[in-house]
Amino acid sequence: MELNRRQFLQAAGAAAATAAVAGMASTAVADEAEVMTAEKADATKWSFEIAPDPIPEDQISQVIEHDFVIVGAGMAGVCTAVAAAEEGCDVIVVTASSTAISRGGSNHAIGSKYQIEKGIDYNPEVARKIVKAEQTAGTYFMDKKKWARWINHSAESINWTIDLMEGKGLKCCLEPGFPDPDGIIDVPPASHNFYTDEQPFGALWGAPIEARTYAQILTEDLGCEIHYNTIAKQLVREDNNTGRVSAVIAQDSDGNYIKYVANKAIVLATGDFSRDRDMMRRYSPVAYEWFKDQLDFETLNYDIELAYNGLMPGDGQKMGLWIGAAWQKTYPVAPMINGGASGPAHGVISNFWGLNMDIHGERYMNEVTNFSYGAMAKLMLPEQTAYSVWDVNYAYTQDSWERFGCCIDLENGIMPSTPEEIIASWDKSAEAGESAGIAATSVYWKADTIEELVEKMTGIDKEKALETIKKYNEYAKNGLDEEFHVNPEVLYPIENGPFYATKSKGATFLTVCGGLRTNDKMQVCDENDQPIPGLYNTGIMTGDFYANSYNFVMPGQNLGAVCGTLSYLLGKDLAQL
């Protein structure tokens, strides 16, 4: 519509008058249609909740029938498939990826034969304290029955995995534990990873090797098929979405629709939903706000493994919702985040235990925690920015410095650093002006005096920082931290040059842990907590296993529990159907 000059002036005058009235009226609100209310929110559907039209039967080019159809060839999917096939089950795996995939490598286990061999006293009774600490951290919102199944069958499942992997030439090692000086989140060596001579870094790259080995066992030894590059699109639930889930329709790389009929059950193991913007906004809103500029909601790569900008689009979760599955009860879905204040870490999953400051030059917490809790604290800071300060003597606060990838007996050849080597690494980083980690980079400084160091530290209140360092040194000399009460055993003064500092911003996003409502037998349930006949899920999309955050207090819990033990048990349970 076009306006002449007179109409334009009339409209402008009316708008000005309206604005004036609105400005004077303290209760004035925007147009009612723009105001969200609880009633409107309840009546609104998210994009992912709206089911697509059913794929017509005449578009289906092939029907393939098996007793069990497992959707997804990540760690959980192939573990479930092998466990079921070993029991004689007729299994097929359908996956969007071009190979079996996974990421990381740490499998937390309780009471394995490998731990017993190494003299590590860790069994369900010993683990009671750390389990209670973890469940308390999750405010008891998680499903404790799932936890009990994991804890009580952890040794059984990891021993099974060790035997399978070693049978194919892989080696197992144990990563160091986390020695909390306060004994609150103290955990012994419990993270098992698998490595080869060609790839000794099992803590970071062991999971892909493990998943591909499961796939090899499934196809070569057990005679089952994996259909790669085949994306599941819809579940088929009988009786107008009130009966049994009997099939899944998938699309192959040529665009053909294939109907996979499951005579007994379908298992969803499709990973997380961190590449779906709406699902992140709806189910993990805090993580969404923190990382929305980092996450990639446009690109889809079903072969993705180690990445920090999102993983999967939530295919399995959506398909479940479309046929009547309920969402998990725990809210929000727990994000997996790490990357605390940077600096020399007493263990690879430690926050920097020395002096941490914010942009105001002030301390903000008891620094002695792990790198996940350290990251959470950093994300709450102004500009999400933390500074760390220490002196050269800090290198001698322990005899050796664990490197990421080390095993407790150094079997894989990755050696810890000596104090002299760690100092050399600080000098190298300071010379470069930065320290590049696995997923993030920190600004690095070095100076001969504290005053010179602080002068180099950009973005911080320098005067306040000097006061804070002075006060911290007094606490260290007196053996009493009067602010945050750091354990005096790890309270070290900053007094002998050269001096070092880092500046780190934000945190590292890995994934989100949760999805469809799932009981302890891994059955997908409806809003009334009733199992949906014929439908299971497993892996990271398992609902209600985690709460608040995945905090790495039991490092390797995700691969060890939902992708390992619970998937193993599901495979064995399927054989009883």
Q: Language-model segments: which ranges?
A:
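Glycine-rich FAD pyrophosphate-binding loop
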Residues: 86-103
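Rossmann-like flavin
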Residues: 125-189, 445-452, 456, 461-465, ...
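N-terminal glycine-rich dinucleotide-binding loop that anchors FAD/FMN and/or NAD(P) in oxidoreductases
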Residues: 105-132
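A glycine-rich dinucleotide-binding beta-alpha-beta segment and adjacent secondary-structure elements
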Residues: 464-549, 553
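Glycine-rich loop(s) and the adjacent beta-strand/alpha-helix scaffold that form part
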Residues: 255-256, 261-338, 556, 560, ...
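Extreme N-terminal leader/targeting segments of oxidoreductases
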Residues: 2, 7-67
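An anion/pyrophosphate-binding glycine-rich loop and adjacent beta-alpha core
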Residues: 313, 317, 323-457
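Conserved redox-cofactor binding core of oxidoreductases
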Residues: 149-256, 277-278, 476-496, 501
